[in-house]
Amino acid sequence: MTAIFRSASADDARFTDFSNQFLMAMPGMVNDELAGTVIYICEHTPRGALGLVLNRPTDLTLASLFERIDLTVAMGPTADEKVFFGGPVQTDRGFVLHAPAGDYSSSIRLGDLALTTSRDVLQAVAEGQGPARLFVTLGYAGWGAGQLESEMSQNAWLSVAADPVIIFDVPAEERYPAAMRLLGIDPLMLAGEAGHA
């Protein structure tokens, strides 16, 4: 997998890269699909951004996903792990965030993690040979050129450096408050709308 978006140019000097960050939706977000979410930003360039929603499990398990795509399952405890709603874009396509990166045919490295969209990583997981840590989604959250920056300037999101522990080890329902705590914020103390004096 090559980079989703192309390299930045000299004209993009003021660009702020949110790659490898968590975005937490602020209370009051009007986009119902992303309200209350924490998103890991996999890639962000001046051309756009791609992220995965971390706290919206589906009813689908890895075992049932593998059955649907005709993979023979020989795996153990990961069979019951949930597949997540990664976002509203390409919801029929799988995205696997994993560590270690490994050598799969369609991957991009994201620091110590990798994002893979090819079937070979799922085949390796089904055979019990896959990455030690994985997070599987259907779909992704995407932003066009300047869209994420605009939403950030409107205070739709808070951002903080991503922590893989939250992605792989924290239960889905606790990921949003855990990401907020990285900023020292208690999500219960956030109001839905800013007040005016």
From Swiss-Prot:
SUPFAM superfamilies linked to this entry: VC0467-like
Gene Ontology CC: one annotated term: cytosol
Sorted alphabetically, which Gene3D superfamilies does this protein's record hold?
A: VC0467-like (3.40.1740.10)
* InterPro entries named among the record's database cross-references: AlgH-like
State the Pfam families in the record: DUF179
- Family assignment from sequence similarity: Belongs to the UPF0301 (AlgH) family.
List, alphabetically, the PANTHER family matched: UNCHARACTERIZED PROTEIN YQGE, UPF0301 PROTEIN YQGE
This chain belongs to which protein, by name? UPF0301 protein BAV3012
Q: Which organism is it from?
A: Bordetella avium (strain 197N)
